[in-house]
């Protein structure tokens, strides 16, 4: 139940009445608790963008009813009363709290009242407001964090500034094929691709609301195109072409191991529908995966490990972070150079993502392999590219952190974390002021703050977008009914 | 014997007789013969009292019908309730079609017969374990809607019928097309083409708007949901034949009315009695004692009544793979696999001990394979099977129980809590959820729970990769990881015996010393004696000894079988019953 901020004076009076026991019968003792209340999600001390959706939460303290007095440094105040501990901010009031409050703070004073009318006042919970807005839309793949089977897979887009959410791709309309990861060209909702696996398989390219289906696997390629990275110019997409196997662990600490048996890099010319190999000069056979372009498009970063065979122990596969210079005019690559030598510290790198200003690169570091989402120890590391120095980020938890991406202004990091239960990934957002100024991350707010507690599905590969994807599930369905355009092959 | 008197018009008594017969036949047949269908269907879905669960059914036309069916299926937990539910729905179908008949062709001598055909074909369909109550509800609601259509044919009623068609489609899905067919046939006879054309226009707009604007469903979903999959039936065309019967039902009743103008009670009653006799004959003919036994075993198995499973299978000696698999698993749970497995048929070798993972087999059938992993202590793999089942089939009582148990055993309490929250929102499993919930706040209860604590002891001590297509390999890996896992060892030895590898059984005897077992299980003794007899001396068994009783039985077996032919042995003639329950007999007969 919400008493909104019509008149601050009246609100203060109501709050005062609440404190004095005026709202309830009984002795009405007020005790001050020398700690913050436990709230879910844990939003205490987080840094939020000035355009984020209401940070609804639920209070995990004993009490028959609760009262939240919300004060912002721009002088706004709202009062929210709750019978079930769930605090939902009215959209309009929330916006007023944020408006003109960049660089300020929001403090929430919480009071719980028990059956006898006794009240407890906790230390205030605070949010810090950053100056920089976050991209207004987020996309993610929603599916069960499963093993082999799948039935429902959707890619959804959600407005970061509100709770509006809709499907972009729904596999119900694609003969329940498997929807693989999606990839945007520089957070651009008008330019993205997604792989579909199954009877209507192919790589679907969406440009505006036009969707085309293509078959990127040419006879020259041993394996299909898998992990993509758009060249910033939008003309090329680098892919890794992988042979992937999945195995399951017997021990309770682990679930799944996804391993490459072989992989190499290819570059796809989107306009000409032509696939080309990234040349390998090395005599040693490597597996190359997870390509990522620098913002200028002159470097191709990727992860590289020594090639193995079927008998190799998956624990021995370690990927370094490597890059090659790319000359777009001549379509030629330089020699590979190691950017982060993970093997030397007995670790493995995956998912390199370069910041929009090209200064930083965030990667996932874990014990082995390249599929970190099933590695509990996987953490995000920040690499200062020019200094060549990598450090574990403060945003990590004891559970898996992975699948990170940058906002278009480079001020926000979106990543998936399994910190709530160790199984299901949730989209976390962290402020990135600079290398040494990273805010406490917060989970993407939901209208019902308890959603994450009961939801078994996982938020996979969350990505920021500068707008709404115009294409929808029916556009993909229509594209699926057309024959896939076969890609050609050319060696430069 | 029912006494029939000639009456000028069809009487209430006959209609009541028909309704009573439908109710009695369906109720009795479901209660006494195929009550396993209730158990099967109740265990393949979980009705959850939550908005999220209900919301899923709102996303597609026909979802509400399935939702209503699932709600009723909860009653299947009790055979009497289940039988009453099925009987009421089928009786209501008969009643509605009787009303339709009366409207379309009063005094028709075939009215009772056609109404009884309508309910009897649905009764026969319902005896398929995959045919669900919402399907019959669909026919019932369609019948009611059709009855409303023909009951009042003024302009306003027609407008209401037309404008409610989209709602009818939303509620019933495919059954709206059935209604469309019935209404079309009826209006052709009535020569009311304007209404028919309008109805088709509304229907076309309804499906187009549904497809293009409202529902994210493929065409097939909009056209055929929630009909049962044709593949569920031995004759896949059955569903379409039944649908066609109902589509042309108005034609049947109108045309049959024209055959004989005056009502003939004898014809009326005898024809519907003939339908019942024929239906009863088909029901009895289709009844499978074997299937009934398998599901009875499954019921005991799900209730963890191991002794019940063992005794039942030893008594009825069912040759079904699933029955034998449950028997072996129950024996393993009781620690008697290598003592007693040959007391019941073993027709499938190691297949009846473990079911290999296959993405080609429907999860509905494959799921049973989870119990091998759970019994042996490969908790992660058991969790995986339960999870795969949940992903493809949704929650059902067995997969959610296993998801909770495996997460509790593995100490993943937050994940367990999610599933417990779901289970708490059910009608019949609330109490069980409460028990699990108490474990979350007090893990000591997990350690003191006989089932969960035992699994925790059997778990691997270190990590290895599961071989999903060859479960036997996992037994060796588990034994290497946890040599004290007596259950894994018993499984290994059981597999070797089923594969008739007596030499390897003997080679693994020393592993018994790694476990707490201080005796050799009976069938292992039999394998050892056979090896000694056929191949040579046994290795040193340290403190383990073969019992005198087994030696004596072996001597008897040799004496008895020495002088009879192989065929006689296979037929079991002249072999003592206790000697048939031995590994030696298995070797001789398989």
Features from the language model and the residues they span:
Chain B
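N-terminal membrane topogenic signal
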Residues: 6-23, 105-111
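Transmembrane signal-anchor helices characteristic of membrane glycosylation enzymes that use polyprenol
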Residues: 15-39, 205-211, 277-283
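Membrane-interface coil-to-helix junctions
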Residues: 28-89
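Membrane-interface micro-motifs in multi-pass membrane enzymes
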Residues: 43, 58-62, 82, 86, ...
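Transmembrane helices and adjacent periplasmic/lumenal helix-loop junctions
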Residues: 130-134, 151-194, 204-214
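Membrane-embedded alpha-helical segments of integral membrane proteins
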Residues: 193-260
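Internal/C-terminal transmembrane anchor helices
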Residues: 263-288
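Soluble catalytic regions of membrane-associated enzymes that act on cell-envelope
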Residues: 283-457, 463, 472, 480-501
